[in-house]
Design a protein with these regions (language model features):
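Alpha-helix capping/helix-boundary segments
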Residues: 20-21, 51, 82, 102-103, ...
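Histidine- and aromatic-rich ligand-binding microenvironments
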Residues: 16-17, 47-48, 96-97, 130-138
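Short, well-structured N-terminal submotif of metal-dependent ribonuclease cores
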Residues: 1-47, 56-73
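Acidic, metal-associated active-site segment
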Residues: 55, 97-114
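Acidic, PIN/NYN-like endoribonuclease modules and their adjacent C-terminal/linker elements
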Residues: 1-9, 110-138
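Phosphate- and divalent-cation-binding pockets in alpha/beta enzyme and binding domains
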Residues: 54, 64, 85, 125-126
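Short beta-strand scaffold positions
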Residues: 47, 77, 98, 117-118
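Acidic catalytic patch
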Residues: 72-93
Length: 138
C-alpha cells in the first residue's frame, strides 16, 4: 500500500481529489486543517481539472465547491503526459478508475505530491509504484 511514507521527505505540494474538495465544501474539519497547514507552509495546492469536472454541475448548488476552487486557484494545465501516465497506472493497477488515475498522474508528472482523498484504497493501488506520491485519507 502507498499510504503515508515516513521514510522519505514529504512532497511539498498538495493535490485535492474530488472527495477532498467535497469535504472542504462541507466544512470538514480534518480537510480544512490539512489545507490550512499546506497553505501555512507555502505549499502549492492544486485541484486537477478532472476533479473540477467531477464536482461541479453548473448550478447554484455548486457555490460551496466554487468557494473552495476560488480559495485554491485555477486548475493547472492537463497535458498529454498526464493521460499517458494515467493509462499506464490503470493498466498496472488493473483498475478502471480513470478520474483517480488522472489525479495520481497529476502528482507523478509534477514530480510527486501529497494527495488528500476520500478514496484511499483506489488511490493507494494506483500510486503504489510511485513513492513520490503520498496518499492521505480523510
Amino acid at each position: 500500500m502507498a499510504g503515508i511514507r515516513r521514510d522519505r521527505q514529504a512532497p511539498q505540494r498538495l493535490i485535492l481529489d474530488s472527495g477532498a474538495v467535497i469535504a472542504l465544501a462541507r466544512g470538514d474539519q480534518r480537510a480544512r486543517a490539512f489545507l490550512a497547514r499546506a497553505l501555512e507552509l507555502g505549499a502549492p495546492v492544486e485541484i486537477p481539472v478532472v476533479v473540477l469536472a467531477e464536482t461541479v454541475r453548473g448550478g447554484p448548488r455548486d457555490a460551496p465547491v466554487n468557494r473552495v476552487l476560488k480559495a485554491v486557484g485555477s486548475p493547472p494545465e492537463t497535458r498529454e503526459a498526464h493521460g499517458r501516465t494515467a493509462g499506464r497506472l490503470l493498466g498496472l493497477a488493473r483498475s478502471s478508475e480513470t478520474v483517480d488515475a488522472l489525479v495520481v498522474a497529476h502528482a507523478v508528472e509534477g514530480g510527486g505530491a501529497q494527495v488528500l482523498t476520500g478514496d484511499r484504497e483506489d488511490l493507494d493501488r494506483l500510486a503504489a509504484p510511485h513513492p513520490e506520491v503520498w496518499i492521505h485519507p480523510l
